[in-house]
Amino acid sequence: MSTNEYVLNMRQVSVDSKTHKNILSIENFTVRPGELVAVLGPNGAGKSTLLRTINLLQPYRGEMQLFGKDVRNTNKTLLRRRSALVFQETLLLDDTVFNNVAKVLKFRGTPTHKIKQRVYTALTAFSCEHLANQSARSLSGGEAKRVCIACGLVADSELLLLDEPSASLDVGIRPQMIEKIRQLAQERGSAVILVSHNFTDILHFADRAIALFDGCIIQDDNLETIIRRPVNEQLARLVGIDNIIPWWVERSSRASFIKLANGIKFLYPGEITKPITACCLSGDTFNVYDASSSILHKPWSVIIEGLVERVLNGIGICSIWVKVGEQTLIARVPRNNIFGNVYPHEIIKLAFNAQDAHFV
């Protein structure tokens, strides 16, 4: 794909703080038209700095193209008008809700006769059309956030940058708001870069994710791979891998055996070529073992025994804390995969596929 077919193309982009400390270092990051990308990372990783840099609000070094145009040789105001940034903070003018949203269109030269309809369409999409004549100062935190999102989407931007869009929203309406943003972006063909600490937002929204640590992209992949196969232990903890266990390998002339710190030992079917420190086992890789379970018919299956410490019955999922050796494993098992009931203080067996083990 040629560079003018990307809405964003960053090469060797660096940003320094006021104290000359490097806070962002992007070797290569591209976004295609219509692509939905999530940005993961701990606090202070540079996520908001990345969005401000893309929106040309942050001085930087390196090469960046927006909409196929070299930023250094193009009017930055014109480029910025083709994108929209919704800040984490609720930044609204001391004016009515209607005028806050309308000013976005006026700044972009939208014909006056089209403004009213577009403003109400944007407000309605995020359930705040009834707030149109209210002062922005009178809004609750959640209402102000929805108005900010409406401001971001009213202009049909080619690139939408969202910094924690679900912050301040009630838990009950977050999925609805995120789904609406996704729907509108897909209808318009807009590319979106979404920063969020809420993994539910990310799972419902993005097809691709980048993991940002200390200002650097450490993994760029589809969501399933990042969640199941994180590149290091830091990211494994961030995405919520249930079980991260120290391990070592025992090799023979014919095979490699993995021995975990809790005493579990199993034959591993693949090759281990890089230095690694921990074995990651997601809770949903486990099955509660039963003699009739189909896990017996899977290759490389591992069966372990432990003492149930705690059981949490959720909607459709049962979370079970099982003490194995000196460590506790967490298994998340579909309720219909459990034969009978599981209670604390009883001995149960768990089974998993060795190929589901991931090493970092």
Language-model region placement:
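Glycine/charge-rich catalytic "coupling/switch" loops of P-loop NTPases
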Residues: N262-R310, N337-V360
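Catalytic Walker B motif of ABC-type/P-loop ATPase nucleotide-binding domains
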Residues: L160-E164
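The feature captures the beta-strand-to-loop junction immediately N-terminal to the Walker
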Residues: L40-P42
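Conserved ABC ATPase signature
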Residues: S135-L139, E143
